[in-house]
């Protein structure tokens, strides 16, 4: 089983809760030979593609037979990160396990199963 942590850090303007940028960190905690950590900035990338294949189309890939070639996407829209199964048009062949909504808002502590991989979502706190 692969365990992945997702950390999100948001920058705010004048305490108005207006998000100008959000950093999303995906970290493999358990299950692969090498530990990996990738951070995505919403100002540069609004769609993160997750899957099994290594290609220019996949931003975060896993060597897991139970993960589809194009498993899911994490999308930054309306100042929030969302996860959606498949490539946005077609669902993944192996499924992404979360509530049965098309787009699911990534909240603090959310756990998502993709194949045998577990994702845990947490927000980074600015100190």
Predicted regions and their residues:
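Forkhead-associated
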Residues: 41-115
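Short, charged beta-turn/beta-strand-edge "cap" motif at the junction between a beta-strand
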Residues: 117-121
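Intrinsically disordered, low-complexity acidic Ser/Thr-rich regulatory segments
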Residues: 1-63, 122-127
């Amino acid at each position: 089983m692969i365990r992945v942590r997702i950390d999100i850090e948001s920058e705010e303007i004048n305490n108005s809760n207006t998000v100008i940028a959000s950093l999303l960190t995906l970290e493999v905690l358990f299950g692969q030979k090498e530990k990996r950590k990738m951070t995505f900035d919403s100002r540069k990338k609004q769609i993160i593609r997750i899957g099994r294949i290594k290609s220019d189309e996949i931003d975060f890939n896993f060597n897991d037979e139970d993960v589809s070639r194009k498993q899911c996407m994490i999308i930054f829209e309306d100042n929030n990160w969302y996860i959606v199964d498949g490539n946005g048009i077609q669902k993944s062949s192996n499924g992404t396990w979360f509530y049965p909504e098309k787009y699911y808002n990534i909240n603090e502590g959310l756990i998502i199963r993709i194949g045998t991989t577990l994702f845990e979502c947490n927000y980074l706190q600015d100190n």
